[in-house]
């Protein structure tokens, strides 16, 4: 697990490097599906002092199997998503400014241009709000459930992120670094959408044929973007 712990540590350290977190407001995890174990950031540990050996290993029920710290308070959310979507290899949660602003506004981040379409096939959805009962109960688990309720049976890697109403963004990917990459892009397109709608409040969504082209040339069966 040492290699995965190092990867998760590096991915967590990318969050402040890319300006996605303030203080300790964020976490990254990754899963070893063969072993059924998840590595995640420890709760409340400052990035400035954090080391790879501080990462916490939990099983799929959330039981700590390795580590001296408590795991992130959002661990149950991560585990619920890993259980539901086998294509996920890494998950990120932040409170990055612009994506969180859309979450607080209760609005999906609209697909307005090709930058968005290169990564997200359509709007980045916003969940419904959690009920008082859901919040007072197993809050973090129910956060995962409301994300799943919103995504349904869609392939999560086609829209690798979501904003949870009144909370903030979650992003995911094939591994921890891919998840962070998608979180960075989500914050950037959230900022772009806010600026674009400020300039032109009547702005429509990107044309569907242009969105399809940009997404499929990177992610479709006949993708040709980048090097083989």
Swiss-Prot record:
Zn(2+) binds at residues 74, 93, 95, 167. It catalyses: L-ribulose 5-phosphate = D-xylulose 5-phosphate. The active site is at residues 118, 225. Binds 1 zinc ion per subunit. GO terms for biological process: L-ascorbic acid catabolic process; pentose catabolic process. Its EC number is 5.1.3.4. Induction: Induced by L-ascorbate. Repressed by UlaR. Keywords: Carbohydrate metabolism, Isomerase, Metal-binding, Zinc. Belongs to the aldolase class II family. AraD/FucA subfamily. This is Putative L-ribulose-5-phosphate 4-epimerase UlaF. The lineage of its organism: Bacteria, Pseudomonadati, Pseudomonadota, Gammaproteobacteria, Enterobacterales.
């Amino acid at each position: 697990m040492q290699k995965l712990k190092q990867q998760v540590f590096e991915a967590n350290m990318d969050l402040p490097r890319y300006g996605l977190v303030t203080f300790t407001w964020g976490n990254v995890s990754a899963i070893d599906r063969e072993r059924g174990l998840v590595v995640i950031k420890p709760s409340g540990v400052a990035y400035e002092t954090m080391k790879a050996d501080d990462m916490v290993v939990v099983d799929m029920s959330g039981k700590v199997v390795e580590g001296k710290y408590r795991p992130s308070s959002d661990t149950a959310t991560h585990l619920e998503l890993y259980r539901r979507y086998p294509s996920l290899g890494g998950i990120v949660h932040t409170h990055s400014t612009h994506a969180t602003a859309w979450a607080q506004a209760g609005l999906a981040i609209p697909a307005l241009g090709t930058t968005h379409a290169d990564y997200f096939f359509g709007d980045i959805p916003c969940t419904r709000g959690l009920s008082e009962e859901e919040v007072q109960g197993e809050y973090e688990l129910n956060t995962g459930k409301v994300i799943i309720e919103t995504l349904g049976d869609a392939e999560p890697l086609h829209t690798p992120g979501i904003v949870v109403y009144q909370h903030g963004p979650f992003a995911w990917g094939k591994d921890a670094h891919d998840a962070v990459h998608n979180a960075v892009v989500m914050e950037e397109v959230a900022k772009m959408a806010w600026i674009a709608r400020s300039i032109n409040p009547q702005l429509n969504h990107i044309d569907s044929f242009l969105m399809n082209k940009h997404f499929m040339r990177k992610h479709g069966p006949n993708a040709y973007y980048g090097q083989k």
